[in-house]
């Protein structure tokens, strides 16, 4: 059986938590490998690069056009012009927090970075994407933000786009940690919501 390896671009990578999850997720016929990552935090970049020395890390603000061009160039070089398969990332979410009603609106600059994530997807056109955020994103603009993002992704061709609220405790993490996910694929096969592997009530 030929094994397919999907190339991954990690945006707003932080020290590399999402990349670690993808790089260790394997099935008989497929695997994932992060090839390019981006964040504007120096400490995060150093940690990421130490743990992933073969991944090209672009340090800089993704809202800067020059940084976006560097990301696109690196992806092209790393994938041999084949393009990126999957884009993952968790845009900074301070403004989306359910505990901070004053910042939970699109007038807050902290909330604009999610649009740059969308812009990179539109430019690089991966086969699939995964966006992670805090649960508060579902309350943003009374749910209109998530509806808007899903609609924009569908306009790009990701008609198979959905959103979930998942609890890390349901998947073996020893703490209750709920997170929002928006996932999309160019493939028309319906995306199934992950089934819990553990009982969160035991935490």
Report each predicted region and the residues it spans.
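Membrane-helix interface linkers and caps
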Residues: 61-62, 67-75
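Class I S-adenosyl-L-methionine
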Residues: 73-81, 94, 98-203
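Short active-site-adjacent helix-start/loop capping segments
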Residues: 46, 65-68, 95-97, 139
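Glycine-rich, N-terminal phosphate-binding loop of Rossmann-like dinucleotide-binding domains
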Residues: 91
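SAM cofactor-binding core of SAM-dependent methyltransferases
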Residues: 9-65
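Conserved beta-strand scaffold positions in the cores of enzyme catalytic domains, especially
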Residues: 35-37, 57, 87, 161-165
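S-adenosyl-L-methionine-dependent DNA methyltransferase catalytic core
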Residues: 1-34, 152-155, 179-203
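N-terminal Rossmann-like NAD(P) cofactor-binding module of classical short-chain dehydrogenase/reductase
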Residues: 85-88, 130
């Amino acid at each position: 059986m030929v094994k397919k390896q999907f190339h991954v671009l990690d945006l707003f990578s932080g020290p590399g938590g999402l990349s670690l999850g993808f790089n260790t997720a394997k099935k008989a016929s497929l695997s994932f490998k992060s090839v390019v990552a981006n964040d504007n935090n120096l400490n995060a970049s150093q940690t990421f690069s130490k743990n992933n020395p073969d991944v090209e890390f672009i340090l800089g603000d993704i809202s800067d056009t020059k940084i976006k061009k560097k990301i696109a160039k690196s992806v092209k070089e790393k994938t041999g012009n084949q393009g990126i398969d999957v884009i993952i990332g968790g845009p900074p979410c301070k403004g989306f927090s359910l505990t901070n009603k004053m910042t939970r609106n699109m007038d807050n600059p902290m909330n604009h970075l999610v649009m740059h994530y969308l812009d990179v997807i539109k430019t690089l056109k991966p086969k699939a994407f995964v966006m992670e955020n805090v649960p508060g994103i579902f309350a943003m603009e009374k749910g209109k933000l998530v509806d808007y993002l899903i609609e924009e992704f569908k306009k790009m061709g990701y008609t198979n786009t959905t959103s979930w609220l998942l609890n890390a405790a349901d998947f073996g993490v020893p703490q209750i940690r709920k997170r929002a996910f928006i996932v999309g694929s160019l493939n028309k096969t319906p995306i199934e919501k992950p089934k819990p592997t553990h009982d969160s009530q035991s935490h």
